[in-house]
Amino acid sequence: MQDERPLNLSVSIVCFNSSGIELRALISSLVTTVEKLRASYVVAQLPVFLIDNSENPQLSLEVFADFSGRLHAQEIELRLVQGHGNVGYGKGHNLILNRIESRYHLILNPDIQLDEDCLTEGITHLESNGDVVLASPFAQYENGVKQHLCKTYPSVLTFFVRGFLPQGLRALFSKRIAKYEMHGLTDRDASTDIPIVSGCFMLCLSDALIRAKGFDEAYFLYFEDFDLSLRMGEFGRLDYVPAMRIEHAGGHAARKGFSHLRMFMQSGFRFFNTHGWRFFRQAG
């Protein structure tokens, strides 16, 4: 055991018409990583809030019935929150903000699978670095291609290049994109003072998350994680911890049709209005 102090952790997952297969894979991986965490820490009962944003919710905890024994053994309590409709990703997570009693809170997408050492590595980093309020993991697609979850402050030009230019033209801006996506980060050691991280996986110091008042609910989808990253950064460091590893299905707004593109542009407009416009100059 590294530490005999009880460690409190909670998890929230916002889903929208998510498949049972996808959610089972996530919860199964969560059980495995919690089991490894318990080998290093005394972990209190762990609430996992499944927040179902579906307009006609069909999700039932019966989906997980066949590994209820594993959940019980690791003292993981699934709590289903539904009936509120599609309120958006950020507001969905905020629905349980006033129910968080843990020292650490993990925000997750449903299309995630966690490596077995993921939580042990993340919690150890946070326990060892008291000024860190949020940790972001190494992520890859199912095919093993790396995702870049850490970002510098964006410019409008960079978003246009990444989202709308064909691959051939996008290659002309490879240095700009690499700078924005922080390709220079090492995957061996933790990197500190990251400006912005993806909302698909945010391991947060709960106190800082609550002080930041969670997500800005004016963002229905997209940029809510950028905004929260910057506001969380007012209370401490955001670190990239590559020893935390996940698999993430992911997706790009500009490739999901007009409705997603419209939401992306509306949220982007709000983000830049709030935090400052940069049309061409790329931070970093």
Stretch-by-stretch model annotation:
Residues 116-149:
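Conserved donor NDP-sugar-binding/catalytic core segment of glycosyltransferases
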Residues 18-40:
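Short, well-formed alpha-helical segments that are part of the catalytic scaffolds
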Residues 226-230, 234-284:
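Active-site-adjacent helix/loop segment of glycosyltransferases
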Residues 186-245:
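A short, conserved alpha-helix in the catalytic core of glycosyltransferases
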Residues 82-100:
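Glycine-rich, basic loop-to-helix element that forms the pyrophosphate-binding segment
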Residues 154-194:
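Short, flexible, basic/aromatic active-site loop/helix in glycosyltransferases
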Residues 49-63:
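A conserved acidic beta->alpha catalytic loop
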Residues 105:
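Short aromatic/hydrophobic "clamp" motif used to bind/position activated sugar donors
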